[in-house]
């Protein structure tokens, strides 16, 4: 087998790593829908899904079967091509955003030097999917939900990017592995506390999760921009939202909590435990907080998050200048 040169083996191993990591992310996103319902039941002192399988363990399988066999309906007056492309773009952009996250020192799909910029680009690409879905559905509620979602996402992406600039300045790199290695002695959550708070808030908003789920507000917009979707097209939006939660949780761990670093246990175990903790925090936030009005969400972003990110940047710049001068 002369074609198995070291370069070919390296390429095959890289492809295998990418497939394994992305399959695990998709599985986590799918399983989180079941885990969320069980945890919400626990938080609200009621039963979660407990009928299919032992203790409801097969509920996810039942949901997948139902979704596969539902009619894949397309509205009569919709733009069929864009209507079909929108969920694919949403799912793919959220999945690709995880590609830059180093799960361990050797396991990362794409160790890019512009890792953070790539994440921001993928987050921005998701806005197009939402706009495509709302406009192509030819439904006023879908369009209103898409307009809300695009305005909210674009606004909070400003704070998302600014909250990361302090981390980039401290590490001197946009590369995620370099940022993790820079936290060997002190996690970024301590010197970049305001950046962490703002990034976590903006991450919830960009994922359109409660309490920032106004684009999908059932009481006002009848489920928003994916009201006309059914079957696997709706499934791509549904699983994509949970993949977004997994990705944002993994980024919080990587950027502010030392990534895979920790004593005794293997690196990927530490990474998985930290990520699972923040995924549970997403669910706890949904269980604990009410949904504010849309104007309150936008006002909170520009009047609270933006000043916090600017203060964080100024303090970080001052500290770096002081350390350089010393």
From Swiss-Prot:
Stored PROSITE patterns: COMPLEX1_ND1_1 (PS00667), COMPLEX1_ND1_2 (PS00668)
Keywords: Cell inner membrane, Cell membrane, Membrane, NAD, Quinone, Translocase, Transmembrane, Transmembrane helix, Ubiquinone
GO biological process: aerobic respiration
Catalytic activity: a quinone + NADH + 5 H(+)(in) = a quinol + NAD(+) + 4 H(+)(out)
Gene Ontology CC: plasma membrane
EC number: 7.1.1.-
Statement: the UniProt record of this protein carries the keyword Transcription: no
Membrane topology: Multi-pass membrane protein
Residues passing through the membrane, by range: 11-31, 81-101, 114-134, 154-174, 186-206, 237-257, 265-285, 302-322
Subcellular location: Cell inner membrane
InterPro entries recorded: NADH_UbQ_OxRdtase_su1/FPO, NADH_UbQ_OxRdtase_su1_CS
MF terms in GO: NADH dehydrogenase activity; oxidoreductase activity, acting on NAD(P)H, quinone or similar compound as acceptor; quinone binding
PANTHER family attached to this UniProt entry: NADH DEHYDROGENASE SUBUNIT 1 (PTHR11432), NADH-UBIQUINONE OXIDOREDUCTASE CHAIN 1 (PTHR11432:SF3)
Quaternary structure and partners: NDH-1 is composed of 13 different subunits. Subunits NuoA, H, J, K, L, M, N constitute the membrane sector of the complex.
Record function comment: NDH-1 shuttles electrons from NADH, via FMN and iron-sulfur (Fe-S) centers, to quinones in the respiratory chain. The immediate electron acceptor for the enzyme in this species is believed to be ubiquinone. Couples the redox reaction to proton translocation (for every two electrons transferred, four hydrogen ions are translocated across the cytoplasmic membrane), and thus conserves the redox energy in a proton gradient. This subunit may bind ubiquinone.
Annotated family: Belongs to the complex I subunit 1 family.
HAMAP family assigned to the protein according to its UniProt record, in alphabetical order: NDH1_NuoH
Name of the protein this chain belongs to: NADH-quinone oxidoreductase subunit H
Organism: Cronobacter sakazakii (strain ATCC BAA-894)
Taxonomic lineage: Bacteria, Pseudomonadati, Pseudomonadota, Gammaproteobacteria, Enterobacterales
Gene: nuoH
């Amino acid at each position: 087998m002369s074609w198995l040169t070291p370069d070919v083996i390296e390429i095959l191993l890289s492809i295998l790593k990418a497939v394994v990591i992305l399959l695990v992310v998709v599985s986590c996103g799918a399983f989180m829908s079941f885990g969320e319902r069980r945890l919400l039941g626990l938080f609200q002192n009621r039963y979660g899904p407990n009928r299919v399988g032992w203790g409801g363990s097969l509920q996810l399988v039942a949901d997948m079967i139902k979704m596969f066999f539902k009619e894949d309906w397309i509205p009569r007056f919709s733009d069929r091509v864009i209507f079909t492309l929108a969920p694919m773009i949403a799912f793919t952009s959220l999945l690709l955003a995880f590609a830059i996250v180093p799960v361990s020192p050797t396991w990362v799909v794409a160790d890019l030097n512009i890792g953070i910029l790539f994440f921001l680009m993928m987050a921005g690409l998701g806005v197009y999917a939402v706009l495509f879905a709302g406009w192509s559905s030819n439904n006023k509620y879908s369009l209103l939900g898409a307009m809300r979602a695009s305005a909210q996402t674009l606004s909070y992406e400003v704070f998302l990017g600014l909250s990361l600039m302090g981390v980039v300045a401290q590490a001197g790199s946009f590369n995620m592995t370099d940022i993790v290695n820079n936290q060997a002695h002190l996690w970024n959550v301590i010197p970049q506390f305001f950046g962490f708070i703002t990034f976590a808030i903006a991450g919830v908003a960009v994922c359109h999760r409660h309490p920032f789920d106004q684009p999908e507000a059932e009481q006002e917009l009848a489920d928003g921009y994916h009201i006309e979707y059914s079957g696997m097209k709706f499934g791509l939006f549904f699983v994509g939202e949970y993949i977004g939660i997994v990705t944002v949780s993994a980024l919080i761990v990587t950027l502010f909590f030392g990534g895979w670093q920790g004593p005794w246990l293997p690196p990927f175990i530490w990474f998985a435990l930290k990520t699972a903790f923040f995924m549970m925090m997403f669910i706890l936030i949904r269980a604990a907080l009410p949904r504010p009005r849309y104007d309150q969400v936008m006002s909170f972003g520009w009047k609270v998050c933006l000043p916090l990110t600017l203060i964080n940047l100024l303090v970080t710049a001052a500290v770096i200048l002081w350390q350089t001068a010393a």
